[in-house]
């Protein structure tokens, strides 16, 4: 169904595969918000295999994303998002997009930026993630304080990822990702 320009693995604090999948979620929020979410989040534990370089098959995608996780888009206050970021720091990184976190090697949050701007406690932000995390699993209980939560029918992470690969392929593009310092250890 497509081609990967590079081997993509998972792992903290950030990785090629987790960056890619978080970005797919962030973009998928368009179907809920009419625009991408401020950030995307996927847990490393939800990614079960590497994406090899070269041909991508549907089977590869099932191996990477074997769970029936669905998209959820949450609207959260900055104070609650900060708690979410503290949880991500304590886990030494998860798959994120749209944000930049500086954490310590002991798992403490030092600085947080959404887009290019420092996180503001009183602002509302949108987060695209999977239902498993939106339900407060994986230490993400900050999501339970969300102001609003929308989980569209039939928007599985696997389906969204397959759609993304097919769309890129139709445009003649290979699947790529990059490490860009979205989570750094200071």
Where are these regions (language model features)?
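Glycine-rich phosphate/diphosphate-binding loops and the adjacent beta-loop-alpha structural elements
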Residues: 1-14
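Feature captures C-terminal
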Residues: 15, 19-186
């Amino acid at each position: 169904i497509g081609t990967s320009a590079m081997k993509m693995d998972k792992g903290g604090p950030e990785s090629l595969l987790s960056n890619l999948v978080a970005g797919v979620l962030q973009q998928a929020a368009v179907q809920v918000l009419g625009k991408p979410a401020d950030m995307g989040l996927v847990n490393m534990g939800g990614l079960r295999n590497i994406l090899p370089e070269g041909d991508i098959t549907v089977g590869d995608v099932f191996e990477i994303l074997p769970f029936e996780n669905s998209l959820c888009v949450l609207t959260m206050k900055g104070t609650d998002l900060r708690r979410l970021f503290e949880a991500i720091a304590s886990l030494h990184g998860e798959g994120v997009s749209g944000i930049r976190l500086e954490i310590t090697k002991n798992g403490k949050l030092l600085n947080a930026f959404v887009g290019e701007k420092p996180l503001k406690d009183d602002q509302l932000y949108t987060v695209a993630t999977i239902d498993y995390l939106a339900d407060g699993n994986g230490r993400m209980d900050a999501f339970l304080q969300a102001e609003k939560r929308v989980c569209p029918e039939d928007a599985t992470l696997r389906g969204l990822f397959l759609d993304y690969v097919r769309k890129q392929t139709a445009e003649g593009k290979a699947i790529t990702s990059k490490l860009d310092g979205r989570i750094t250890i200071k």
